[in-house]
Regions:
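Conserved small/polar residues in nucleotide/adenosyl-binding loops
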Residues: 356-358
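Short glycine/proline-enriched loop/turn "hinge" motifs that connect secondary-structure elements
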Residues: 112-114, 340-343
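Non-catalytic interaction/regulatory segments
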Residues: 1-96, 100-309, 317-328
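Conduit-forming functional cores of very large proteins
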Residues: 84, 341, 353
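Phosphate-interacting basic helix/loop segments used at nucleotide- and nucleic-acid interfaces
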Residues: 332-336, 340
Length: 358
């Protein structure tokens, strides 16, 4: 009887908070013990949106009894329970440790219709040396989680830079894209080594992205741009003086060199809907790139996305060629360079001036 009275009071309180005609929750005792009616009502926008068709909604939050090195995450999911194997690696790649989780089935009653969604409530450990201000990092983390969940961003440990370096998910995609290009251009270090180096020196990683952004931000005037780039180069060089490991120093310097060798990018462009373009593209001057094998093209364009990446090599302002699919994921640039060299030989023996008769 006492339990029934408690449940009745919870439901009564929740109904009092809800507008007339609003959906009502059908939840079990475990949910009622975990969340107050006020907390449940505060979540109704996410609950109803998920029940009405959105695949997933999330919220990072901190309970009153949690310290600054703890955080919680609510995942509202439409289509049944999300496996831990999908949630945990994503969160670990953002830098969190997962300490516990609770799962609740929530019935959303609207008229005679009841839709059931799932709530995963997860408790997280915040990385050491990170003071996580939810007002600042909350939106960035939610954006990153959803981008990875929907497959528009790679699920790897480059994403730790969101917390470590104070970047957003698209900023991190730029650093990841340069790492992919460095792999093709002959750097001897693995992607794991590169991401670990950036994570170890997050202030330098942030400066490298700022160097990229300052070089191409259309809002900057030319004088302001040159002054900003000069200041950033000095700051980065000073910071590199504190990197004792030679391999890490080389990795970071190759990043700086790749950014300095970039002539154009589509990073600041928007699509027809006003959203950032899904693919990143960088146009390089190969003569400026360190470590690039010969022969060096006149220009080189690198395109990167979560599902495809590639290079376009051209040895002159006017060039002809075609598209080719490669299954050599680790060194497709070497394959493309070989094809371009063969085309150069063909072009050398083609008579440039000819005649035609009818």
């Amino acid at each position: 009887q006492a339990v029934g009275d408690i449940a009745a009071r919870w439901i009564d309180h929740f109904v009092m908070l809800s507008p007339v005609g609003a959906p009502v929750l059908d939840v079990d005792q475990a949910y009622q013990e975990a969340f107050t009616p006020d907390e449940a009502f505060a979540d109704m926008a996410d609950i109803v949106a998920t029940a009405e068709g959105e695949p997933v909604r999330i919220e990072f939050y901190r309970r009153d009894d949690q310290s600054e090195d703890q955080l919680s995450l609510k995942i509202f999911h439409r289509d049944g329970h999300l496996p831990l194997s999908r949630r945990v690696p994503l969160l670990e790649n953002l830098g969190f440790g997962v300490t516990s989780e609770r799962t609740f089935d929530i019935g959303v009653v609207s008229g005679e219709t009841t839709r059931t969604i799932v709530l995963h409530d997860m408790e997280l450990n915040v990385p050491k040396d990170v003071k996580l201000d939810l007002a600042v990092y909350g939106p960035r983390l939610e954006e990153a989680f959803l981008a990875v969940f929907h497959g528009s961003v790679d699920n790897d440990n480059f994403n730790r830079l969101i917390l470590a370096a104070g970047l957003n998910v698209r900023d991190v995609s730029v650093l990841r894209a340069y790492a992919r290009y460095l792999r093709q251009s002959g750097i001897v270090y693995s992607q794991e080594h590169i991401s670990e180096t950036l994570f170890k020196y997050p202030a330098i990683a942030a400066k490298i992205f700022e160097l990229f952004a300052s070089g191409f931000d259309p809002k900057l005037g030319e004088k302001s741009r040159l002054r900003k780039l000069s200041d950033l180069h000095k700051e980065i060089e000073t910071a590199l003086g504190g990197v004792p490991n030679l391999d890490e120093d080389r990795t970071l310097r190759r990043y700086v060199n790749a950014v300095d060798s970039t002539l154009r990018t589509n990073y600041f462009q928007r699509d027809a809907n006003g959203l950032p373009k899904a693919m990143l593209a960088f146009k390089f001057d190969p003569k400026l790139l360190d470590g690039l094998p010969d022969p060096r093209p006149f220009r080189e364009i690198f395109v990167y996305g979560t599902e495809v990446e590639g290079v376009h090599l051209r040895f002159g302002k006017v060039a002809r060629g075609g598209l080719r699919w490669s299954d050599r994921g680790q060194d497709y640039r070497t394959e493309v360079l070989g094809l371009v060299k063969a085309q150069q030989v063909k072009n050398a023996v083609i008579v440039q001036i000819g005649r035609a008769h009818v």
